[in-house]
Amino acid sequence: MHCVQYQAGRCHSCQWLSIPYSRQLEDKQRHLSALLSGHSVAQWLSAQPSAELAMRNKAKMVVSGSVERPLLGMLQRDGSGVDLCDCPLYPDSFAVVFAALKSFIPRAGLTPYSVARRRGELKYLLLTESRLNGEMMLRFVLRSETKLAQLRQALPWLQAQLPQLAVISVNIQPVHMAILEGEREIFLTSQQVLSESFNGVPLYIRPQSFFQTNPAVAQALYAQARDWVQALGVTEMWDLFCGVGGFGLHCATPEMTLTGIEISAGAIACARRSAAQLGLTKVSFAALDSGAFADAHSAVPQLVLVNPPRRGIGAALCDYMNRMAPPYILYSSCNAQSMVQDIERLADYRIEKVRLFDMFPHTAHYEVLTLLVRASA
């Protein structure tokens, strides 16, 4: 993949861009194998590759420059802005949106936020696209509501230019820190979710709810989880850290009792909507802390699926799972190091299957799916 910004030394987000893609995949597989070298793995599956460019469905653009000439991209260490509208990770459909936004920002008088001076209003633009129908969600991250009325007044022009913007919102992030978003979301459109579909499973994307940024690889990841779970023939499972329900809804059958737990109420609303659309009557989702939920329930499901943040599930939840002793644990991780730490805590489980998914090409990061089986199962 050729990138002008990388070649010019202005952006190094894709640290491995100079490495041929086939070798990137080999290096990631070697890294994962080394991390698990102290464990017996019954079956290694071949790594799931990614497209090398235009694979992302989301852009997180720092807004810098001036209101007359905004830059959309990132900040360098010296505080100067780098425009990344030509980033080859984004699909072609993003280019027209970025161009229109550069005209809209001065129309609406949205002064870019200056980190050095702690002045200005517009901090980020967050763009997400649905592969299902091409609809997009655009979020303006503002320091305050000072420019909200101006934004509303100018918005019809933007909507006329970009009818694909089905969901538009403002997020208020008042803190002078490198925090992407605040708690308050103000919708500027009647539609508040994007519709998506992976492997025939309807999914919904809301502001502030996690959704994978590489949809083709995410689709393969969910399909692999479904195939492994269905081969086990389980009829009761928990989906902890479930997000919008991608894993659980892929694994669920009409006969299965599935409980999905996620801290985000918005994500749970999306998961419930998907379950209703699929006609799954034995599926329930609740907005709770996953660890607290597990600790409060004495019933033991046949399988627990976990998809935690980078820190992993941690010692407390591992200890609980050892005591609860479900026959199977399906662990999806975006940080193999924390996953291996958790596996070492799950002393009563052996590793049955492992597969790497290259969710983040041109970087050292990857996703991994691991099936753990209780030694006595």
Curated annotation (Swiss-Prot):
This is 23S rRNA (uracil(747)-C(5))-methyltransferase RlmC. NCBIfam families: meth_trns_rumB, rumA. PANTHER family: RNA M5U METHYLTRANSFERASE, TRNA (URACIL(54)-C(5))-METHYLTRANSFERASE. GO terms for biological process: rRNA base methylation. It comes from Edwardsiella ictaluri (strain 93-146). InterPro entries: 23SrRNA_MeTrfase_RlmC, MeTrfase_TrmA_AS, MeTrfase_TrmA_CS, SAM-dependent_MTases_sf, U5_MeTrfase_fam. It is an enzyme of class 2 (transferase). [4Fe-4S] cluster binds at C3, C11, C14, C87.
